Regions:
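Short aromatic-glycine motifs in intrinsically disordered, low-complexity regions
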Residues: 1-6
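A short loop-to-beta-strand scaffold at the N-terminal edge of the catalytic core in hydrolase folds
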Residues: 7-19
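Residues that flank catalytic or metal-binding motifs in active/ligand-binding sites
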Residues: 10, 27, 54
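Soluble or luminal CAZymes and related metallo-dependent hydrolases
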Residues: 12, 88-92, 174-182
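Short, conserved beta-strand segments within well-ordered enzyme catalytic domains
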Residues: 13-15, 28-30, 59-60
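Short beta-strand element of the alpha/beta-hydrolase
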Residues: 24-35
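Gly/Pro-rich cap/lid or specificity-loop segments adjacent to the active site
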Residues: 35-120, 124-127, 131-153
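Alpha/beta-hydrolase-fold enzymes
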Residues: 132, 138-191
Length: 191
């Protein structure tokens, strides 16, 4: 990781659509966003859509911490649970590039796209790997986390800490009222 921490046997989950051409350059990458997973990108993929698997080889990598990639819930010791290290957009992009190179020997990415936090990853891709990425599209994403985003995250944290079951930065049973509050915070941010 960017921090220098090594997560033993880290892995990145992903899903692909379409066929990789012989030049290995008909690639679109659309990573998942905060709390998202590859299945949630599926509705945006289809014949005649911008993410058309008849034309492109589409790779949907899952972000670290979403459960389909290395996360606090599935990491090996000593990185399990509350000991899970900080993971940055840079770390996700580095893992995604390795996935593309090691698994598919990609020579070029036609489009690096993303929504929200994966839009932030699209910016990182364009800045760090301009040799590989031809185009980037960030939908509702920022190049860095804004004060508005930090305020939302602080609201989530306050809601989580308000549950009666919160002890030592951990909760094993969520109060339904708290979950409703968290959903309301998320809905407000989506407006």
């Amino acid at each position: 990781l960017q921090s220098g921490v090594v997560i033993t046997n880290a892995f990145i989950g992903y899903r692909t659509y379409g066929t990789l051409n012989s030049e290995r350059n008909n690639v679109i990458v659309f990573p998942t966003w905060y709390t998202g997973n590859h299945d949630q990108v599926a509705p945006y993929i289809g014949s005649g859509k911008a993410l058309d698997p008849d034309k492109y080889f589409i790779v949907i990598p899952d972000m670290f911490t979403n459960g389909a990639s290395t996360s606090p819930s599935n990491a090996e010791a000593p990185c399990q649970g509350l000991n899970f290290p900080l993971v940055t957009p840079f770390d996700n992009v580095a893992a995604q590039r390795r996935l593309l190179e090691d698994n598919f020997e990609i020579s070029q990415v036609q489009l690096m796209a993303g929504f929200s936090m994966s839009g932030q990853q699209a910016y990182h891709w364009a800045a760090l790997h301009s040799d590989l990425v031809l185009r980037a599209c960030s939908i509702c994403g920022t190049s860095k986390t804004t004060p508005h985003n930090w305020a939302m995250l602080a609201a989530y944290k306050s809601a989580f800490e308000a549950t009666t079951n919160w002890q030592q930065n951990c909760c094993n049973a969520w109060d339904p009222k708290i979950l409703k509050l968290v959903a309301s915070i998320g809905a407000t941010m989506a407006m």
